């Protein structure tokens, strides 16, 4: 137990001596940074027992502030003294800080140089090329031009004035088109006269006359009907009705043949 306590005391003494020597020999840089979407905008490496800034993220908080530079050794971030911190401990510290928090940063300058291997891999660090999310504000002239474009793209047909093809998937939702069969055929019937006749050029061609489609009844059916209707008729009347029935049957057959010929030409 005594050996362990002695070692810890010796380490603390060495660290305090190092702090004293560093503070006396190097310049202390102090600034305030606001945590943004890219954090503090720093690429930090572990150089021995210290956390050193190797690069600044383009358009990050540190790059926009312009005070911290690559090569600075971090002393404190906020109220936490980060001298002797590992990268894992430093990451845990930053994870508990929310966006928008203003932190006071202290660092030593000119104390340690960045290792050469880190200077050569600047283009390989993806954090230095983060895209900066931004939402451009639309000015009034831009809005007026968009309104004019919308009016120019409106459909001239009054029947389809509520339908417009989508210009962009992101800006204009697709609208359901109006039923073409309902709209187009609806007003066409009101404006056009339909011709009906036997001529081929007519819209509706009649192949048979309605009067000729009435077939004569069967002679047997006519005889039965006559028997039921007139039970007390004379023999001469029955003979005339039966002869009329046969004559109607012959007339129906002739008309049926004429109808077939007309349908061929139609």
UniProtKB/Swiss-Prot annotation:
PDZ domain: residues covered: 27-109
Gene3D superfamilies per UniProt: 2.30.42.10
Protein's name according to its UniProt entry: PDZ domain-containing protein 9
Pfam families listed in its UniProt record: PDZ
InterPro entries per the UniProt record, alphabetical: PDZ, PDZ_sf, PDZD9
Organism: Mus musculus
């Amino acid at each position: 137990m005594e050996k362990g306590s002695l070692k810890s005391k010796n380490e603390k003494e060495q660290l305090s001596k190092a702090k004293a020597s560093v503070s006396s020999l190097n310049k202390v840089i102090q600034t305030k940074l606001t945590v943004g979407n890219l954090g503090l905008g720093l690429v930090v490496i572990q150089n021995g027992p210290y956390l050193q800034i190797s690069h600044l993220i383009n358009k990050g908080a540190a790059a926009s502030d312009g005070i911290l530079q690559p090569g600075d050794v971090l002393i404190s971030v906020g109220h936490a003294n980060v001298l002797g911190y590992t990268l894992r401990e430093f990451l845990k510290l930053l994870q508990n800080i929310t966006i928008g928090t203003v932190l006071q940063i202290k660092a030593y300058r000119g104390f340690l140089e960045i290792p050469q291997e880190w200077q050569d891999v600047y283009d390989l660090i993806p954090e230095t090329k983060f895209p900066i999310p931004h939402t451009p504000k639309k000015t009034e002239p831009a809005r007026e031009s968009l309104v004019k474009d919308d009016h120019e793209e409106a459909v001239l047909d009054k029947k389809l004035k509520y339908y417009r093809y989508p210009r962009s998937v992101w800006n204009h939702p697709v609208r359901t088109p109006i039923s073409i069969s309902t709209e187009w055929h609806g007003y066409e019937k009101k404006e056009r006269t339909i011709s009906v006749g036997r001529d081929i050029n007519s819209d509706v061609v009649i192949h048979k006359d309605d009067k000729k489609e009435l077939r004569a009844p069967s002679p047997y059916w006519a005889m039965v009907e006559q028997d039921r209707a007139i039970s007390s008729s004379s023999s001469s009347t029955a003979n005339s009705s039966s002869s009329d029935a046969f004559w109607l049957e012959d007339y129906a057959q002739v008309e049926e043949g004429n109808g077939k010929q007309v349908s061929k030409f139609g």
